[in-house]
């Protein structure tokens, strides 16, 4: 509730005098609950999100609880580190990098390719074989989307160069950078709040319109969910949709029909929203959307944890490809 009120106060400065008077009158007559109801309506208006993002730096996505972004280009053979401060991406350093000898996207174990996409860093390793330099950051490959695409392999790291000085022209699929820079990064970043975005060719900046469409879309989807509007809710799912456990769209529809038929009242709150572009070789615009979901249903079921979506945009509307 406090977050929502703060969220509304930030938006307050963009309201007309008449809208402010109306909000104050609603508060006077109905209290905080009335204000919440009014502010919730703004979340369902794309123009709100367009205005919200207008002055923010969103070239690598929209992040509420990420501090650093690694941006890699396989074509340019480089890796850049950006720090996110006050919704601006500040370049910390850019260095040449070595990628897998197979220039394509990674598909199977042992194909010597560096994966393309968006990946969290999951661990920091030290005391490795000298081949990997002083340390390595472990990426989340294969992520949820990769696994559902039947991609295999593991052990994709950002690591250093051999300590014996025998530098190679390519890696087995990892990203390798010079040891001094890697050691510097170890001191500067919190890997748990760092994401790696790897592009197959030139870096394509995320569009504000796409990000506004996604933010608007997930809140309309949420509203349909809260109000048991099955048709609207299901309209956000692509025909190619696959749930984390392999359930495809036809069975998912039937499952949700049974769930929505209970007509339970529920509350659903989203926070800590992170939206990253998800590059690919096929050129289709995809995004990874991750946030904290706080779900409470009348029947007693509760969930508070991470929701992960992979989405695309079709005809100006998000379509969910993968969900967990």
For each predicted feature, which ranges?
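Sec-dependent N-terminal signal peptides
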Residues: 4-13
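N-terminal pre-domains immediately preceding structured catalytic cores
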Residues: 17-116, 120-131, 136-154, 161-172, ...
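A conserved hydrophobic position in a structured secondary element of the catalytic/binding core
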Residues: 177
């Amino acid at each position: 509730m406090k977050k929502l009120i703060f969220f509304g106060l930030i938006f307050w400065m963009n309201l007309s005098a008449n809208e402010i008077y109306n909000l104050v009158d609603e508060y006077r007559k109905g209290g905080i609950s009335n204000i919440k109801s009014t502010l919730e309506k703004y979340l369902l208006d794309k123009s709100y999100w367009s205005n919200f993002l207008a002055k923010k730096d969103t070239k690598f996505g929209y992040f509420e609880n990420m501090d650093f972004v690694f941006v890699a280009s396989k074509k340019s053979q480089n890796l850049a580190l950006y720090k996110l401060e006050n919704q601006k991406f500040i370049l910390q350093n850019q260095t040449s990098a070595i990628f897998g000898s197979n220039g394509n996207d990674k598909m199977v174990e042992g194909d010597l390719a560096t994966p393309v996409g968006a990946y969290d860093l999951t661990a920091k390793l030290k005391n490795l074989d000298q081949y990997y330099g002083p340390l390595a950051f472990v990426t989340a490959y294969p992520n949820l989307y990769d696994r559902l695409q039947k991609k295999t392999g593991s052990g994709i790291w950002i690591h250093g160069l051999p300590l014996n000085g025998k530098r190679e022209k390519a890696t087995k699929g990892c990203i390798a950078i010079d040891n001094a820079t890697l050691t510097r990064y170890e001191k500067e970043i919190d890997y748990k709040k760092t994401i790696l975005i790897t592009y197959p060719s030139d870096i394509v900046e995320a569009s504000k319109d796409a990000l506004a469409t996604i933010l608007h879309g997930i809140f309309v989807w949420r509203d349909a969910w809260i109000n048991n509007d099955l048709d609207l809710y299901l309209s956000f799912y692509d025909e190619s949709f696959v749930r984390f456990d392999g359930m495809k769209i036809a069975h998912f529809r039937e499952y949700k029909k049974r769930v929505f038929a209970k007509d339970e009242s529920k509350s659903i709150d989203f926070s800590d929203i992170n939206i990253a572009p998800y590059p690919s070789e096929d050129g289709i615009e995809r995004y990874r959307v991750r946030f904290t979901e706080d779900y409470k249903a009348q029947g007693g079921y509760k969930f508070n944890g991470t929701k992960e979506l992979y989405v695309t945009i079709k005809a100006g509307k998000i379509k969910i490809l993968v969900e967990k």
